[in-house]
């Protein structure tokens, strides 16, 4: 395989978890509650997958228990947010910092007891820190290429579900079209709560792909991908399939940064900060599309045509 083929595969490997994270963030944006918690949940999901994989000796075991626990926890948080009429943005920030804190605590205590033999101790900071865990000895660790293909396929299936089913159409308009759904007798709050669980599933998939690709767990596993996913939502104009090219674009820039690190042309600190800088630029420069714009008018026509069809039936 040539240099170009190797580079393309490397970029696709990087883009797969980012596309999953962007799909989860877009799901919450559709419901009107932007998933500001994606960065922390991805990190916490990576920690849970690595921890249970070390305990049970199976990558699939760690992924299975995490994909059940994390979305369920987010769903309960969403239910509490709706019942208490709390601000979902502030709740999302609290979830983010809580997830980051639990990941750091678990990496320094739980891993030390569960898999001390697999630890690579980092003494560069404050004494001995059990924060870098090798998963090389776990069973049934599949090839990363399969995970990348499955991730893109799941994003495509999610896209088809949203645009091809009545529930998917309701879900897409549960944020901006909440009043229209209420007139029809559908409670938009249910879709808002479900969107948190959907974002949790996508975050677990992103964390699982990161663990699968790297083969280790570190507290910096997410590396800003949660924030980049939020930027992709607006860069892709809230279109599910546009999230994949946007994720590939950001992954290409990330790969370029890794290549430039070996040349010492650009300071390392600037390269590390580049994904965050690009996310900030996208947030500032990308305008939120209003309902009167062409894309929103098309979605509104689809919604009201669907409502008219249901009413006439």
From Swiss-Prot:
Keywords: Cell inner membrane, Cell membrane, Membrane, Transmembrane, Transmembrane helix, Transport
Membrane topology (UniProt): Multi-pass membrane protein
Residues that span the membrane, as ranges: 4-26, 36-56, 60-80, 88-108, 140-160, 194-214, 240-260, 265-285
The keyword Acetylation belongs to this UniProt entry's keyword annotation: no
InterPro entries in the record: ABC_transp_permease (IPR001851)
Places the protein is found: Cell inner membrane
Listed GO CC annotations: plasma membrane
A single MF term (Gene Ontology): transmembrane transporter activity
Domain of life: Bacteria
Subunit architecture: The complex is probably composed of two ATP-binding proteins (RfuB), two transmembrane proteins (RfuC and RfuD) and a solute-binding protein (RfuA).
The family this protein is said to belong to: Belongs to the binding-protein-dependent transport system permease family.
Role according to the record: Probably part of the ABC transporter complex RfuABCD involved in riboflavin import. Probably responsible for the translocation of the substrate across the membrane.
Protein's UniProt name: Probable riboflavin import permease protein RfuD
